[in-house]
């Protein structure tokens, strides 16, 4: 039986993870949130050292020896489930600099590939370099996007201490960092289908991806 692969890329707050989760549940596929792996590394570094020091050899050794496992989208560091700690503010603050490090990207790549290769039925993987690097052979490649203003409003509606203006500035800065980073920058591939979901609900976005997938599936 063929194992179907759906790649979902996009900038911050574009709805990648929520949409991918809904698509996976509707199709009966597995779902891998790539961002959680970078968050797990970040959390491990902050918990061990109190800060993230890019290029630090001691921290590099720590990361390379760190055991990271994914089970049903729960993330385990050295056997401990740290899933509930991945959205802490301190992780938010440092994850961008962590994701820039080439050796960390290589470690995460290895974990992603091991999860994907073990899947038998189908998998939806979301992130920022899925179609370009992680699953260049995906059956369907989707690039989700929306204006920075729309994405800032979504984040603002989730609650939290930051104002809309602060969130908008943060998203614009993250977009710039993602698109200009040296290793695996955020970009829509020539064969990715771009979905601008400013005026679409989560359900509508998921249904559109499923419609596109059914079209691909019909040719296999």
Swiss-Prot record:
- Annotated catalysed reactions: CMP + ATP = CDP + ADP; dCMP + ATP = dCDP + ADP
The protein's enzyme class: transferase
Query: What Enzyme Commission number(s) does the record list for this chain?
Result: 2.7.4.25
Q: Which UniProt keywords apply?
A: ATP-binding, Kinase, Nucleotide-binding, Transferase
- Annotated binding of ATP, by residue: 10-18
The protein's matches in InterPro entries, at most eight in alphabetical order, are given as: Cytidylate_kin, Cytidylate_kinase_dom, P-loop_NTPase
**Molecular function via GO:** ATP binding; CMP kinase activity; dCMP kinase activity
Q: Pfam family of this protein, just one?
A: Cytidylate_kin
Which family is this protein grouped under?
Belongs to the cytidylate kinase family. Type 1 subfamily.
What NCBIfam families would the database entry show?
Answer: cmk
Q: Could you identify this protein by its name?
A: Probable cytidylate kinase
């Amino acid at each position: 039986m063929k194992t179907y692969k759906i790649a979902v890329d996009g900038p911050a707050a574009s709805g990648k993870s929520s949409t991918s989760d809904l698509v996976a549940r509707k199709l009966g596929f597995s779902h891998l949130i790539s961002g959680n792996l970078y968050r797990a590394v970040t959390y491990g570094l902050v918990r061990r050292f109190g800060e993230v020091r890019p290029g630090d050899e001691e921290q590099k050794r720590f990361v390379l020896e760190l055991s990271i496992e994914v089970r049903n989208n729960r993330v385990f560091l050295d056997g401990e489930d740290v899933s509930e700690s991945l959205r802490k503010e301190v992780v938010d603050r440092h994850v961008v600099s962590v994701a820039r490090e080439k050796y960390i990207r290589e470690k995460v790549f290895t974990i992603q590939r091991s999860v994907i290769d073990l899947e038998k039925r189908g998998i939806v993987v979301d992130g920022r370099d899925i179609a370009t690097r992680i699953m260049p052979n995906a059956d369907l490649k989707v690039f989700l996007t929306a204006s920075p203003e729309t994405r800032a409003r979504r984040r603002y509606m989730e609650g939290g201490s930051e104002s809309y203006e602060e969130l908008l500035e943060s998203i614009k800065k993250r977009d710039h960092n993602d698109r200009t980073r040296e290793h695996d920058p955020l970009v829509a591939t020539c064969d990715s289908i771009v979905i601008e979901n400013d005026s679409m609900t989560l359900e509508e976005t998921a249904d559109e991806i499923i419609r596109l997938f059914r079209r691909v599936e019909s040719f296999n």
